[in-house]
Amino acid sequence: MKHGKNFTLGEYVIIKKPELVKVGNNVRIADFCRISSGGDGKYTFEMGDCSSLAAGVKVWLSSNDYVNELVTHSIPEVKEIQGNVRLGKYTGVGTNSVIMPGNDIPEGVSIGALSFVPSNYKFEPWTVYAGRPIRPIKKRNKENVIKTLRKAGYLKD
């Protein structure tokens, strides 16, 4: 796993194929998170600067579609949904949320606790999302976030 400065990894975190994981500066992956490559293991997970996964977040880079006759991961012929997952700068994912394959989460997005992010969801930057499945709740104030990070010493002018 490649990581930037001030990276914090919680306890009991499971990262399958850490060589496919890249995180930026000032990033936290809290306790009990799981990042699972599955499938053929070629898909990547990236976290931008000042982003975080709260406790218990699950990130899947591969999953079964569960709509055909063979609905078990032990059979290789099962159709899988696979894709990279990327979290942009200043993003946060709340406790026990689930992120499915193929998501590009843009700068400033915040995902509330216990949320479910379906594959290939279309996000708007600087927006708060929550729910099962997620939906937009409200906009975030980019200037206030940046100001707070600067004041805390995480960003330089």
Residue spans of the language-model regions?
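Flexible, glycine/small-residue-enriched loop-and-beta-strand segment within the central core
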Residues: 11-104, 120, 132-133, 139-140
